[in-house]
Amino acid sequence: MPFVVMITGIPGVGKSTITRLALRKARAKFRLVNFGDLMFEEAVRAGLVEHRDEMRKLNPNVQKELQMKAARRIVEMAKTEPILIDTHATIRTPVGYLLGFPKEVIEVINPNFIVIIEATPSEILGRRLRDLKRDRDVETEEQIQRHQDLNRAAAVSYAMHSNALIKIIENHEDKGLEEAVHELVEVLDLAVGEYD
């Protein structure tokens, strides 16, 4: 039976780092798939963008088409191995927030778990300011909190259309990265035996 875990969090929350470390410790051997990378590959193929950070500026209807193409690719992969999707539940665009997974897309992927990584707005802002490699929009702490609140609401919506369980993992500076990694490993190890 396919086992798919979606891991989400707004930019700067530490999602990719936690994911990478948890995959090393988990007993279940997941294939890590970055949903944005799959969408980006489709967008480049169509001549729509040259750089990944241009994706969020695309027309929302075009983004939805790219989402569906990426979802179908994930379903094929999940037939043979457990999949961990590194993604964003919502994407801030110039005209508003876009759901990372409209109803049709989440129904195609049908994840078992939706994991949300969170931190305080001040921690996220600090991490973003230290990460000079990415072209990120500047947001206030209030906007960052609003984005995290929207992610929670989106996760509930996704769970309604997929029966996924929701797990919230906090990645605070004082809590330690190790605890957040441990919590994700516990979720991933539920896939042990699903592909035997």
UniProtKB/Swiss-Prot annotation:
Species this chain originates from: Thermococcus onnurineus (strain NA1)
Top-level division of the source organism's lineage: Archaea
Residues binding ATP, per UniProt: G9, I10, P11, G12, V13, G14, K15, S16, T17
GO cellular component terms, semicolon-separated: cytoplasm
Protein name: Adenylate kinase
Pfam families named among the record's database cross-references: AAA_17 (PF13207)
Keywords: ATP-binding, Cytoplasm, Kinase, Nucleotide-binding, Transferase
InterPro entries reported for this sequence: Adenylate_kinase_AdkA, P-loop_NTPase
Catalytic activity: AMP + ATP = 2 ADP
GO molecular function: adenylate kinase activity; ATP binding
UniProt-listed Enzyme Commission number(s): 2.7.4.3
